[in-house]
């Protein structure tokens, strides 16, 4: 699936993009995974990456919270793909694009995530390494993982 990426700070998203992102996040995080508050104060201190299909329908999004808000490093979170976009590599495209955007904004910085535990292998395939024991967040098992950018040989 080819996606057109939008990368913007919260204040620059525009009401339609913000609505699209929150609607998709609510559909997955609240309706599919059980009720908890999704929008939080970190949204305003984040970049948001949105992937739209050819018809202009949001299929995937994530946010990158600024360093110093949740962790010392920038942190990727609220990673979500629409149900109809799953199983075709959309999630892989989303995370890869998110890591690339992190390196554009914070070159050479590590990236931290609080991953749902069942996705540890998925994130591990990008080079994320577990740095905590499993814990519950919103009644869902999670694990902290850290990605360190590859060293570029000069």
Short names for language-model regions:
Residues 95, 102-115:
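Conserved GNAT acetyl-CoA-binding A-motif
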Residues 1-58, 154:
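Short amphipathic alpha-helix that is part of the acyltransferase structural core
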Residues 67-76, 86, 105-109, 139-141:
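A conserved beta-turn-beta hairpin within the catalytic core of GNAT-like acetyltransferases
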Residues 114, 136-154:
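C-terminal "cap" of GNAT-fold acetyltransferases
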Residues 81, 87-100:
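Conserved acetyl-CoA-binding loop-helix of GNAT-fold acetyltransferases
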Residues 117-134, 138-141:
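Conserved active-site alpha-helix within GNAT-family acetyltransferase domains
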Residues 50, 57-67, 73-80:
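Conserved beta-strand in the GNAT
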Residues 39-44, 68, 136-138:
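A short beta-turn/loop motif at secondary-structure boundaries
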């Amino acid at each position: 699936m080819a996606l057109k990426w939008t990368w913007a700070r919260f204040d620059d998203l525009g009401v339609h993009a913000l609505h699209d992102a929150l609607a998709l996040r609510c559909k997955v995080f609240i309706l599919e995974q059980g009720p908890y508050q999704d929008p939080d104060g970190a949204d305003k201190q984040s970049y948001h990456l949105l992937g739209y299909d050819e018809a202009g329908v949001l299929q995937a999004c994530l946010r990158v919270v600024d360093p110093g808000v949740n962790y010392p490093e920038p942190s990727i979170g609220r990673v979500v793909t629409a149900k109809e976009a799953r199983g075709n590599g959309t999630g892989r495209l989303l995370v890869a694009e998110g890591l690339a955007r992190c390196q554009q904004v914070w070159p050479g910085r590590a990236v931290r995530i609080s991953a749902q535990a069942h996705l540890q292998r998925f994130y591990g395939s990008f080079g994320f390494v577990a740095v905590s024991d499993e814990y519950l967040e919103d009644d869902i098992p999670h694990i902290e993982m850290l990605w360190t950018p590859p060293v570029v040989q000069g």
